[in-house]
Amino acid sequence: MVRINEHYIEISNSYLFAEIAERVNEYKQNNKNREVISLGIGDVTQAIAPAVVEAIHKATNEMACTKTLRGYAPYEGYDFLIQAILKNDFTDKGISIEADEIFVNDGAKSDTGNIGDILGQDNHIAITDPAYPVYVDTNRMAGRTIELLPCTPENYFVPNFPRKTADVIYLCYPNNPTGIALNAAQLKNWVDYALTNKSLILFDAAYEAYISQQDVPHSIYEISDAKKVAIEFRSFSKTAGFTGLRAGYTIVPKELIIQTSKGKMLSLNAMWRRRQSTKFNGTAYIVQRGAEAVYSIEGQKQIRKAIDYYRGNALTIKEGLESLGVTTYGGINAPYIWVKTPNNLTSWEFFDLLLNKIQVIGTPGDGFGQAGKGFFRFTAFGNKEDTLEAVLRMKKLLEFH
């Protein structure tokens, strides 16, 4: 008799954004003459940088020639991309990372979800609440115990330490969904906690390109001794518009040495390399050439232009809602604006109000966890015209609601 992984019973039947898509599609079917504007799922709208497109075209042409054809990529990524990452994201910023600590992937979601493969099932997991659903769901799928760390206006969305000592801690900063960032002192507190308690921090830095304030670290490795306690995840999705291309990378320092139940010391770097060689066949050559071009002089100028475009959208949403007396958070160091729902509406009531009355989509906060109840997330990834129109519609609605 076949047995299933019954931990799947403990998670929601549908992924948050799949549920939203289902509701929106149903609305569109019944209201085909209505123009719906999405400020919901964090998918990009601006074209891939020309430097990246040119590199992808060139790599595609290489694949058409027997002499330059590339097959399976190295499990950890091609050296040309690893060296570009190393120089631009770390060495030039004074951060010491070695090439064999970088693992190229097909997007941060894969590795944040799969990192649990090398971690024991009996680890006590601490996750901020609200949080990117993947952190919670993947650990529930594995049957691990989870302690949620509420992030609310009362603690300025900066979590307190767990009640029970955490073995593994998920931190995403700048944060999805709240848009809040940790300064260096706040992040150091967590590194010190991990050092004291022999914990592992899983640090999701997918939105570091949107940091605008000087005292906000772009990498956890800016904090002294963080390489002893932290794995960092990076993404090209929001930095360079790779949501449809799929590329990112993970840093697993060689200083991360964990003791087994029998007292043997094992390297997480070696374990992750072994895991990847078994379950991952590498990111496509064409995509990695595109990612390499992100670090070219022209590529950097072009992606910065797109990032500034999205930052402008964030400011439009934030200022527009605040002009109505709506309380907002984030939007300064991240492409997300976290909103207190007006008039004591629940998150889903506000979702339905916006969809049915003005055809604007956002994301209900309680889809990110219990602490998200009564909140709502807007993203800055729409195009400028749609963002302005959505804010105008919300102003007309909320002024009289």
Curated annotation (Swiss-Prot):
Q: Which residues bind substrate?
A: Y15, G42, K109, Y132, N176, N281, R377
Gene Ontology molecular function: L,L-diaminopimelate aminotransferase activity; pyridoxal phosphate binding
What reaction is this protein's catalytic activity? (2S,6S)-2,6-diaminopimelate + 2-oxoglutarate = (S)-2,3,4,5-tetrahydrodipicolinate + L-glutamate + H2O + H(+)
Q: Which PROSITE patterns match?
A: AA_TRANSFER_CLASS_1
Residues the record lists as N6-(pyridoxal phosphate)lysine modifications: K238
Q: What is its EC number?
A: 2.6.1.83
Name the chain's protein. Answer: LL-diaminopimelate aminotransferase
